[in-house]
C-alpha cells in the first residue's frame, strides 16, 4: 500500500520486482477506482530503460471498479512496461500508469483504449477522472493461482 510504504518508484521496484500475477488497485484524486492485472513477471532489470513485456496468452487486463468495466489486452506486445523509474504501467499508450511519487504530481497520464480495449468508447475523464491525475493511494497484491 503506497500510503504506508511510499509512492516512490524505488518502493514499487523493491517490493514487486521479479514477481508475477500482480493485481494493482488505484484510487485517483478524482475518486475513480481503477486497476490492472498481469500474470507476467515484473522484471525491471539493472538498466535505466523501459522494457515492454509481451503477454502472448492475452491474460492481462485493466479495469474500472467505478464503472464496473474490464478492458482486455488487444496489443500483446505492450501488456506491461517495467522501469526502475516508474510504478506499474499497463499498455504502450499508457492505458494505466503510476509514475514516481504519483501522489504529488499530475504526470500520471492515461490513454485508455490504446493497448487495452473492451470494444466500446470511453473517455479519459470517465476512466481516470481526467487525462492527467493524482494517485491518492494504490495497493499491489500478488494473486496466488
Residue map of PLM features:
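Phosphate-recognition beta-domain surfaces
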Residues: 1-23, 27-145
